[in-house]
C-alpha cells in the first residue's frame, strides 16, 4: 500500500494554512502589490495547481510557502509552525529539511553526473533516500552516470525533480516545471510528478499558466491580480497522458 493510500484512510491533515497574505514590493516610488489578501490550504498527499497569467502572484505565493520570501502581512503556517514569525535560520532549516523545489530551469552542475547532482542534496539531508532510488522514481535508472550535456531537456528536468525529492520532503513546490519543454517532453515530466505524489504521498503544488495541466490536479486554485479568485475540485482527474497543449 502506498504512503498516499495510507494517508487517505485518515482525515487529511493541513500542510499549509494561509490567511490574508499580502506582499508589496517597493519599486522606486511605485508600490507593486503582488498578493492582495490570499487565503488557502494545502493538504497532505494533495496535488494542487496554482493557475493564472503572468503577474497574477503565483510565484510570489509559492516563494512564501517555500520560505524563499516573506509576506508583508497576513499569516502562513507549515503544519503548526508559523512561518511569518520564523527567523532566517529557521527558514533556512525549513527549506533544507522539509521542502523540495523544482523550477523551470534545471540548475544542474555541469561537471557532475545525474547521480552526483542528486547526491549533492542527499549528503546534507537528515533522512534522504538513495540517489539511485530517487532517479529510479523519475525513470532515469539507465542515465544515472550521464552528465547534463548528455541528457535531453526533459531528462535534465527529471534529474532536478529527483534531486528535489531525494531528501524526502513533505512538500514539493514546482514553478512552471514544463515551461521550457515541448508538450511531449512536458508530459513525461508531469508523469514523474504524478508518480511521486501517488507513491510517496508528497503534498505537491504546481504553478503554471497552462490551463491544460490543471486537469491532473486534485484542486485548482485560480489567481488573478494577486487574489485567489476561484478554487475548483476535479472530481475526475486526468492522467498526464490525457493532457494536450
Language-model segments: what does each one mean?
Residues 1-24, 229-245:
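ABC-family P-loop ATPase nucleotide-binding domain
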Residues 14-223:
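ABC family nucleotide-binding domain
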Amino acid at each position: 500500500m502506498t504512503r498516499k493510500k495510507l494517508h487517505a484512510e485518515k482525515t487529511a491533515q493541513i500542510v499549509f494554512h494561509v490567511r490574508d497574505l499580502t506582499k508589496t514590493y517597493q519599486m522606486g516610488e511605485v508600490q507593486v502589490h503582488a498578493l492582495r489578501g490570499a487565503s488557502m490550504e494545502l493538504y497532505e498527499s494533495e496535488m494542487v495547481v496554482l493557475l493564472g497569467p503572468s503577474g497574477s502572484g503565483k510565484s510570489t505565493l509559492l516563494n512564501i510557502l517555500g520560505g524563499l520570501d516573506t509576506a508583508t502581512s497576513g499569516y502562513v503556517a507549515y503544519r503548526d509552525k508559523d512561518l511569518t514569525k520564523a527567523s532566517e535560520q529557521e527558514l533556512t532549516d525549513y527549506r533544507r529539511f522539509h521542502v523540495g523545489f523544482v523550477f523551470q530551469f534545471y540548475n544542474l552542475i555541469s561537471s557532475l553526473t545525474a547521480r552526483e547532482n542528486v547526491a549533492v542534496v542527499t549528503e546534507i539531508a537528515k533522512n534522504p533516500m538513495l540517489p539511485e532510488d530517487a532517479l529510479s522514481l523519475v525513470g532515469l535508472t539507465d542515465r544515472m552516470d550521464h552528465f547534463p550535456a548528455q541528457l535531453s531537456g526533459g531528462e535534465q528536468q527529471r534529474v532536478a525533480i529527483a534531486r528535489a525529492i531525494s531528501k524526502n520532503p513533505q512538500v514539493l513546490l514546482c514553478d512552471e516545471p514544463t515551461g521550457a519543454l515541448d508538450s511531449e517532453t512536458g508530459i513525461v515530466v508531469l508523469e514523474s510528478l504524478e508518480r511521486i505524489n501517488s507513491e510517496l504521498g508528497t503534498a505537491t503544488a504546481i504553478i503554471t499558466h497552462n490551463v491544460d495541466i490543471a486537469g491532473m490536479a486534485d484542486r485548482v486554485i485560480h489567481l488573478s491580480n494577486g487574489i485567489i479568485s476561484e478554487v475548483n475540485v476535479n472530481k475526475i482527474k486526468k492522467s498526464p497522458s490525457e493532457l494536450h497543449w
